[in-house]
């Protein structure tokens, strides 16, 4: 694990972008993408760049269950707003939150991931240590699955909705087992509210109670944090 401390999320986005650029020059074909506020500056750097993604595949970590892709709170909408509309890919993949048969959707998404090994995975981290929507207690070897969102996650995401009652209670998420197969993982985290999770992830025991702690076992992980998020290291 390599930890890089930056002044702010703008600098963090630039460093994450530089790491991506290096991997693309080395032949990266598939990007694993995350949503939430942490990776936004990374996407802004991509949009400003001259990088061409027309021959590349993207695979997103997760999507809410029960929300249409056209809904402005869906992760599909988020990705189009922050990246896809400006930088077209050969193929974009997200779980279908409106799939009638979630078991079949899980099989479909696992097949997509298996057919497109992820070269570069961008991650955020939840206050409770979740990566993707893999909440505490999630088995480390799990692949795509339906998640019942933790109350802390629902509360954290409620700022994007009119009311906490509007926040979906379930999501489809790429599993930790799939995330760990990514060749390179870059995790970005900013703000004091992430400090406890960052410290536990890096210094604590490897335990399913802290999903991100499994990253200690990965061969190529870069953690980009501002001083606040790094304050308990």
UniProtKB/Swiss-Prot annotation:
Matches recorded under InterPro entries? Glc/Gal-6P_isomerase, Glucosamine6P_isomerase, Glucosamine6P_isomerase_CS, NagB/RpiA_transferase-like
Annotated EC:
3.5.99.6
Tell me the GO BP annotations in alphabetical order: carbohydrate metabolic process; glucosamine catabolic process; N-acetylglucosamine catabolic process; N-acetylneuraminate catabolic process
Q: Among its keywords, does the record have Hydrolase?
A: yes
Q: Which GO terms describe its cellular component?
A: cytoplasm
Q: What PROSITE patterns has UniProt attached to this entry?
A: GLC_GALNAC_ISOMERASE
Give start-end ranges for the coiled-coil region(s). none
Gene3D superfamilies tied to this protein:
3.40.50.1360
Where are the active-site residues found? 62 (proton acceptor), 128 (for ring-opening step), 130 (proton acceptor), 135 (for ring-opening step)
Molecular-function GO term, any one: identical protein binding
What are the protein's UniProt keywords? Carbohydrate metabolism, Hydrolase
Metal-binding as UniProt keyword = no
Record pathway: Amino-sugar metabolism; N-acetylneuraminate degradation; D-fructose 6-phosphate from N-acetylneuraminate: step 5/5
Cite the PANTHER family for this sequence. GLUCOSAMINE-6-PHOSPHATE ISOMERASE
What does the function comment of this entry state? Catalyzes the reversible isomerization-deamination of glucosamine 6-phosphate (GlcN6P) to form fructose 6-phosphate (Fru6P) and ammonium ion.
What protein family is recorded? Belongs to the glucosamine/galactosamine-6-phosphate isomerase family. NagB subfamily.
What is this protein's record name? Glucosamine-6-phosphate deaminase
């Amino acid at each position: 694990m390599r930890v890089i401390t930056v002044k702010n999320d703008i600098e963090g986005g630039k460093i994450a972008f530089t790491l991506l650029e290096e991997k693309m020059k080395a032949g990266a074909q598939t990007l694993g993408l995350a949503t939430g506020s942490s990776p936004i500056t990374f996407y802004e750097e991509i949009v400003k760049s001259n990088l061409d993604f027309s021959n590349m595949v993207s695979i997103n970590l997760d999507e809410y269950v029960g929300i249409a892709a056209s809904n402005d709170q869906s992760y599909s909408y988020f990705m189009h707003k922050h990246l896809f509309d400006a930088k077209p890919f050969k193929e974009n993949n997200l779980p279908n939150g409106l799939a009638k048969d979630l078991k079949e959707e899980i099989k479909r998404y696992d097949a997509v991931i298996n057919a497109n090994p992820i070269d570069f995975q961008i991650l955020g981290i939840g206050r409770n240590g979740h990566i993707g929507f893999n909440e505490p207690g999630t088995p480390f070897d799990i692949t795509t699955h339906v998640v019942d969102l933790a109350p802390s996650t629902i509360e954290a995401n409620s700022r994007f909705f009119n009311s906490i009652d509007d926040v979906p209670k379930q999501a489809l998420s790429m599993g930790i087992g799939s995330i760990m197969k990514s060749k390179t993982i870059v995790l970005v985290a900013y703000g004091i509210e992430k400090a406890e999770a960052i410290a536990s992830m890096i210094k604590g025991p490897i335990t399913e109670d802290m999903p991100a702690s499994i990253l200690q076992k990965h061969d190529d992980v870069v953690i980009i944090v501002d001083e606040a998020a790094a304050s308990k290291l």
